[in-house]
Structures are given as C-alpha cells and as structure tokens.
C-alpha cells in the first residue's frame, strides 16, 4: 500500500487493495451527503460516535482509502463529533464509509454528474406547482397529478370595488398553500434567473419533462416563463403601473387537492415592494428571453418601464392593505432593497444612465453591501450581484470596490462558519422558519465571490451547504422530498396531504429545524419546520445549477494561480516574480505554467507579473486579459 501525508493536517492515509472482512451494519451516526460528491472537491462525513480509523469502501468491498477522523465539539448540536475527510478519493464509483466500532454509512456516489438527477427533481417540483392547469408526472414509479385548478383567477373587488374578473392564471402555487404572492416570487424568480446568467452554458442543454420541452426555448427558461406569464397579469388594469401584492383566497383553504379549492380568489391591493419586484423580474425576463422570443421580451420591458415610472413618481414605502385576508402577508419592513434591485435590473437590460444613477445612489445608502443571510424580505444582494458582474461601462469604481470588498468578506465569513461547524452548515447556529432555504441560498454569495476572486474554498463551502441538506446534518436525513437518505415523508403541502398517496410530491426542500438544530419534526402539521416554498426551492435550484454539466477545476485553467493551490493571491505573485527573475527554475506543474500566462501570449514573463499585480490590487477586474 501507499502511505502519505494528507494536506489538511498531518494525518497518515493509506490506499490499499484490501477487502473489508468485518460485516458492518448501517449506523445513522455516520452522516454525509447521501447524493454524493464531485471529484477533485471536498468530501467530508460527520460521525457522531467515538472513533478513529475510517475506510472508504467500494460496493464490492474493496478498501480504497484509510483515514483518521479528527474530533471537534460542535457548538450548535452540543456534541463531540468526528470529521472524516476523504477529499483525495476522486475515482468515479459507488462507495460507503466503514467505521470500526460504529458501522457503515449509506452508499454514495462520486461522479461528475452526481447532481444532475437532484437538479431535475427540484425543477420537477416547480413544474408540479403550476397553477391554472393540470399537471402530471411519474417519479420513482409513482404517478402524481391534479386537474386544472384556479381557472377563475382573479376577482378585482379589492382593487376597484367591482366583482369583475381579470385573468391572472398561470404561475406557481407559493408553498404549502395554493395562493400566489408577488414578493415571494421576487426572490424566487431572481434566484433562478441569476442561476441562468451565472451558469447558462451548463443549464441550456438540460432537458426537463415539461409540456413545452419541444419548443425552441431552453426548458429551464420555459419553466420560468410560466411564472412570468402570471407576474405580467399583476399590474393594475388602470395602466398606473401599480402591482397587486398577491392573488389569494380570503383565508387559507383546507388540505384538499388544488382543483377542489373553489373559494373565490382576489387581487390584493398594491404595495411598493411588489411593484419594485415586478420591475426587477420583468426587466430580467426581457433580456433573458430576448434571444428566444423578442416579442415576449418587448412585452416584459414595456411593462417594467410603466411600473418603474410609477415608482419614481411615488417614492413612499406603501404596504398592501391586506385587512380582508388572513393568508401570507409577505410585508417587508422597507422597500429600499426592492427599489435598488429594480434599478439594477433595468440598467443591466437597457443601459440607460438614469437607472445606473438610481442604483448607485441607492447602493450608497447601504452600509453593508452584501448580507450573508437574505431572503424575500431583503433582495438587495440580487441587485448588487447584477451590478458587480455587469460588463456595461460607466460603473463607479469606488462603489464597485466597496461591493467587492463586502462580497469577499462575507464569503470568507461563510467559509469560516462552515469549516467551524460540525456538519458544515454555512448558516452556523442561526435558525428560523425556512432556514434551510437560506443555507442553500448562501451558495449564491459563494459562487459570485468565486467569479470575482477564484478560490476553491468558496466552491467547497457551496458544496458543504448542499451536503448539509442532503444528509450531513444532525438527523442523517435528506431535507428534500424524494431524494437522498430517509427524506421527508409528511411535508406541510396540501397536495401531499390530500392525494391519498403514501409518498409526498417530489423535489421539495422543507424549511428545517427551529428554534434549534434538534427541532425539526417530519409531520404535516409542522408548517414551522416542514413546509415547502418556491423561494426555498429556487435557492436549492441555484445551488445545484452550479454543479450541473460541471467541469472540474482540475481540468480548467485558473489564470493567476501560479502555485496551483486553487486560489489567486499575493503568494502567486511572489512565486511568479521569482520564476521570471529565475530565482526558481520551475513552477509546480504544467497547469501552473498555463495559469501563469495571464495575458495568454504563450510566454511567461514580466508582462504577466505586471498584469497579475494589477489584478491583485483590483485595477484589473478579470483574468485573463
């Protein structure tokens, strides 16, 4: 066997062709990502039992890796746990962890495409939430369907005092209930459109089982269009640009199938937050659909302009009058974040200086540019990301720098939080209703940071967040229906409770435990911990999108990473200077030589030193040039 030093901390490791001889039994104290892992990235398990040695074992019993687990006290769950790090196992296959004196884990895969099915299942979940139509799908041999629902959406009584109807069909049911809320659509659509813009080449070829699968629009965007079609109906019929806050029954309905809910549904009066979120969503839709359906794009941007103009002339934060309704309020404390996001998306789509100035003036009012913890009630991050990654000219360099600094500081903080948590939870010890959604939403911060300043720590922390919701948690359970180890069976979801089928509808992330890590209960009545929601699912979709049709960085050139450690920093500049001055004769690898050629002229010389130094002080925004 081969013996060596594992880089994360002088631990002896062995690679051996020996076979497991002991009969290990499954033990739920060995907690890991039951979906699996990507080659050349972090792979960790948490063992809630006293142990030392662990083995990574192939399905046929061959031991491919022997390691020593390291102990730590988890301040969150208040238990001593042992971390098994097997990141150096990269051969594709199916494995399990065997821990002497404890037992074995669930089987898991190591593969480049390990998240493809999970991504498609989360997208299937969105399709199955469609309102105003019938839906039908077979998953794991079980058929899920319902008939056309809510085809009378919606009445205008609370808008104009008349019991008349304006079409507001389509869109997704929001959560465990069947209502439709513009403000929660904001973070949902924004997250999914950003997934498209950040990972377009990876998502464009993905085939989904949806009715529109044979048209000329990518399937991922087809699903989003179904929601935008509804969003467009939410403008007031008077042409003012005001946007209704939601379409809803007066009270929450019972646990019945959607086609059996016949209570009248109404447009609920406008709010400034809903109007601003409408602007942002339709502005994004305009630029994203333009290559595929220019007429639709034009419809979207024209609607966005009308509502933006209204907001400009009506600067006050206006809350929706929801006095006739007991359904979800989605009432934001402030609309400053919504208006900032609207300005960013209008500028990115149209390029007019008016929108740029609006965004920059608003962004200057935010003392913290990037928040680690964000959801429907704080969408400022979405606008900051769009502005920061925009290739349009005219940005304020000082503001760009301020947002970058905040982004990288926040991303670094998330990495530290994950590394110091016994289960790699990126949100640390913070818990509230729907916190699982935030855990996977934080991958957005990490991925944008990785675009601005490539760092494998950011990518691995994003994978930690995914691992947490698929089994590396206190329960050793997946938090996503239909996926992974022992997933939720009783979500707070009216379809799952009313259809007479034992298995819940698939592809939904449940909210997770609160007020603490041990407070999740898998029962239908626990809306506090076991509800589903489009904003949480969209966050999961973003998290998984980054690793669909993924190319391992092992094979990619990371310009500026002269020492080939997966990061670009001052250490690389020092090595590059020494190499150019011939103080060292070689770079660590052939990949490092490619990484060092930051101007791509086929040579490594003083020009590369100059460019890399300017990049590190952020005079240059991107490598290579």
UniProtKB/Swiss-Prot annotation:
Effect of residue 222 to A: 72% of wild-type activity
Segment forming the signal sequence: 1-17
Keywords, comma-separated and alphabetical: Calcium, Carbohydrate metabolism, Cellulose degradation, Glycosidase, Hydrolase, Polysaccharide degradation, Signal
Any Gene Ontology biological process: cellulose catabolic process
Entry-linked Gene3D superfamilies: 1.50.10.10, Dockerin domain, Immunoglobulins
Effect of mutating residue 531 to A: 0.3% of wild-type activity
Listed CDD domains: Dockerin_I, E_set_Cellulase_N
Matching InterPro entries: 6-hairpin_glycosidase_sf, 6hp_glycosidase-like_sf, Cellulase_Ig-like, Dockerin_1_rpt, Dockerin_dom, Dockerin_dom_sf, EF_Hand_1_Ca_BS, Glyco_hydro_9
Enzyme class name: hydrolase
Its EC number(s): 3.2.1.4
UniProt-listed Pfam families: CelD_N, Dockerin_1, Glyco_hydro_9
Reaction catalysed by this enzyme: Endohydrolysis of (1->4)-beta-D-glucosidic linkages in cellulose, lichenin and cereal beta-D-glucans
Dockerin domain: residues covered: 555-625
Reported effect, residue 522 to A: 1% of wild-type activity
Cofactor: Ca(2+)
Gene Ontology terms, MF aspect: cellulase activity
Result when mutating residue 293 to A: 98% of wild-type activity
Family: Belongs to the glycosyl hydrolase 9 (cellulase E) family.
Name of the molecule in the record: Endoglucanase D
Gene encoding the protein: celD
